[in-house]
């Protein structure tokens, strides 16, 4: 019973520390002005070792315990493990020297596995709220900007965290579709010419379809936003072993002191859902009338050609007469 209480106390203590932990931003690199989120974390592990790795315990520890941690979020170190180095197995013999090649490992009679302590340095990507990061833009829409950090981690900047004086320019999707359809209609006539001129490459319509996007954002100076973009971390989401970052392009002074978000209306703060056609109730009723027309059904007749007459159900009338007679 005391062990259960002790486990509950430890769990509550861990929750309290995690809840009230002070967020500390990572140091800023003076060369590029971004936060250095990659840190070295020395850890000690008590690991098991399979019998097949007794001759080479370092390889066994790496394959069994360290390699599965790489490029995954680890809650104990608070980030994504990028790699490790400096693996050392501690000798169970306290009298042995550190530079000895042979290490004493604990083995019990009930299992063929060995157990030992080891020290290793983990390189962890730990983004914190308030850090300044850079990412390459890979998607732009009216509701957000999607970025890729270090070609591995996703980041998103929502519309509410984009400056008000920025404007999103939509691509004319209908014109691109017309170009594709026109090119497909004329593809039979120009197929041989396109192959000769482009070396067997695809036609213009397919090229337009491959490069079609939702649009792009334009800043206050009218310059399109593309390539690498610098932002501030607003929130870090850890779902399972995957990490995603929410960023903002608005400084704290503009957001708090000047009431930045209050300048947006409630309609602008709502998420944007793009629809090609908005159907109203009147249009729905008209479409239903046109689609649901009366069907011309043939008359059902008996074998001799006479019309079928359905008699009314006389059970109710018989019940009424019987009740009156009673």
Curated annotation (Swiss-Prot):
Record flagged with keyword Nucleus: yes
Claim: Phosphoprotein is one of the keywords in the record: yes
Keyword annotations: DNA-directed RNA polymerase, Nucleus, Phosphoprotein, Ribosome biogenesis, Transcription
Modified residues (Phosphoserine): 244, 251, 265, 269, 285
GO MF assignments: DNA-directed RNA polymerase activity
Any one GO biological process: ribosome biogenesis
Regions of compositional bias (Acidic residues) in chain numbering: 309-326
GO cellular component, one term: nucleus
Biased composition (Low complexity): 182-202
Chief place of localization: nucleus
Protein modification: Contains an average of four phosphates per molecule.
Ranges of Basic and acidic residues composition bias in the record: 288-304
Subcellular location field: Nucleus, Nucleolus
InterPro entries tied to this protein: NA-bd_OB-fold, RNA_pol_Rpb7-like_N_sf, RNAP_I_Rpa43_N, RPA43_OB, Rpb7-like, Rpb7-like_N
Region (Disordered): 179-202, 288-326
More details: Present with 4070 molecules/cell in log phase SD medium.
Family: Belongs to the eukaryotic RPA43 RNA polymerase subunit family.
Described function: DNA-dependent RNA polymerases catalyze the transcription of DNA into RNA using the four ribonucleoside triphosphates as substrates. Component of RNA polymerase I (Pol I) which synthesizes ribosomal RNA precursors. Besides, RNA polymerase I has intrinsic RNA cleavage activity. Through its association with RRN3 is involved in recruitment of Pol I to rDNA promoters. In vitro, the A13-A43 subcomplex binds single-stranded RNA.
Subunit note: Component of the RNA polymerase I (Pol I) complex consisting of 14 subunits: RPA135, RPA190, RPC40, RPA14, RPB5, RPO26, RPA43, RPB8, RPA12, RPB10, RPC19, RPC10, RPA49 and RPA34. The complex is composed of a horseshoe-shaped core containing ten subunits (RPA135, RPA190, RPB5, RPO26, RPB8, RPB10, RPC10, RPA12, RPC19 and RPC40) where RPA135 and RPA190 form the DNA-binding cleft. Outside of the core, RPA14 and RPA43 form the stalk that mediates interactions with transcription initiation factors and newly synthesized RNA. Interacts with RPO26/ABC23 and with the initiation factor RRN3.
Protein name: DNA-directed RNA polymerase I subunit RPA43
Lineage of source species: Eukaryota, Fungi, Dikarya, Ascomycota, Saccharomycotina
Name of encoding gene: RPA43
